[in-house]
Amino acid sequence: MPEKPDQRAAVVCRGVRGATTAEANQREEILTATRQLLALLIRQNNIQPADIASAIFSTTPDLNAEFPALAARQLGWLEVPLLCTHEANVPGSLQKCIRVMVHWNTDKPQNEIVHVYIKEATRLRPDLSQLPPVDWDELEAWITEHTER
């Protein structure tokens, strides 16, 4: 029996936030850190590329060796509109930081969205940094499996 329209969860566009840090201003460091961040966002929220409306990436001004959005393309986000920008250069703020805001079409309520803050970026949102321990080797294997060649 088909569901009545009022029984289905509405699909809305939700913001999913995340941040990480890179070890150095080097192309591969930026891409690796961004892929790790995106992989955790994808896995924690069960995000499918077809459900992503857009994503905005920002880096602190000390990271300019590569566009972090390239990491999303490498993970198969080929049709997703992506934008990169720099964060405001606020004295004393976290350095070598990559942030992302993913606009995701989902039926999940806001309180079920998992925001991901890892590495040094955990200090930006300690209230949202309570992920279970990350098995970095297993995560890298997942990234390798899901990276476009």
Outline where the language-model segments fall.
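Terminal domain-initiation and capping elements
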Residues: M1-R149
